[in-house]
């Protein structure tokens, strides 16, 4: 069975835009959990445009209470600032079930590509993965359906990949879908779990899962 994790960033974004406490992030997240989802996903960015560190701690406690998975996305190179504790520090403090590493820049509106790990970067990235895993957190990498990059992710010690599904959502053709199907089977063959996310919704998810029965999909922004 494929687990469903809902990204609640935009609930926090709307709350912050209003400058008030509503919509209430915790209340709506609990409603989602009570409706049957298996996980909550957040992407706390250094500029705090939506999810804040306080949100991360509160959602972590909610997920523990409700026995659902908590997935934190972000760039491992995001350093501490006056308002942000740094991504790795936050992960090691919260110890989420899963950490999804995303290669985005601080001012990027949304994630729009997967990792391109060079051979010369393997040792440094492997150290990051091992550091996160000391928190008993599963490590996943956001990746395009690129077999060589999936191999690299396996070599640095991650447990899962998250297939970036933006291109599929824009063009759900058999040719595009076949690329994801090949990537899925390759990842499984070398022992990786497979998640998928980005612009997936009720209109395109059923077709995707018919060919790519991922361990987890995430929806929302």
Annotated model-derived regions:
Residues 60-118:
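Glycine/small-residue-rich loop that forms an oxyanion/phosphate-binding "nest" at active or ligand-binding sites
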Residues 59, 79-93, 146-156, 196, ...:
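Catalytic cores of alpha/beta
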Residues 1-70, 76-78, 92-94, 151-156, ...:
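Conserved N-terminal beta1-alpha1 strand-loop-helix module at the mouth
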Residues 38, 43, 99-108, 160-171, ...:
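Glycine-rich phosphate-binding active-site loops on the catalytic face of alpha/beta enzymes
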Residues 16-18, 109-123, 166-177:
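Glycine-rich tight-turn/loop motif centered on a GG-T
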Residues 7-13, 45-47, 73-79, 104-106, ...:
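Active-site beta-loop-alpha junctions enriched in small/polar residues
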Residues 34, 49-74, 118-140, 174-198, ...:
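Alpha-helix-loop-beta-strand connector modules within alpha/beta enzyme cores
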Residues 1-17, 109-113, 125-134:
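N-terminal small/glycine-rich loop or linker at the start of catalytic domains
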């Amino acid at each position: 069975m494929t687990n469903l994790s809902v990204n609640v960033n935009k609930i926090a974004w709307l709350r912050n835009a209003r400058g008030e406490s509503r919509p209430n992030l915790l209340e709506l997240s609990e409603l989602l959990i009570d409706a049957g989802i298996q996980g909550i996903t957040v992407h706390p960015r250094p500029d705090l445009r939506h999810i804040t560190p306080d949100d991360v701690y509160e959602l972590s406690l909610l997920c523990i209470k409700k026995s659902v998975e908590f997935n934190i996305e972000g760039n491992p190179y995001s350093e501490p600032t006056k308002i942000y504790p740094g991504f790795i520090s936050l992960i090691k403090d919260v110890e989420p079930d899963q950490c999804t590493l995303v290669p985005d820049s601080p001012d990027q509106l949304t994630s729009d590509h997967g990792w391109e790990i060079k051979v010369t970067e393997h040792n440094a990235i492997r150290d990051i993965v091992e550091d996160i895993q000391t928190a008993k957190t599963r490590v996943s990498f956001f990746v395009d359906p690129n077999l060589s990059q999936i191999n690299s992710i396996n070599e640095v010690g991650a447990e899962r990949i998250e297939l970036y599904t933006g291109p599929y959502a824009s063009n759900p053709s058999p040719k595009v879908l076949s690329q994801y199907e090949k990537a899925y089977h390759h990842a499984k063959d070398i022992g990786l779990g497979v998640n998928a996310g980005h612009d997936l919704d009720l209109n395109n998810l059923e077709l995707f899962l018919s060919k790519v029965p991922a361990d987890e999909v995430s929806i929302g922004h």
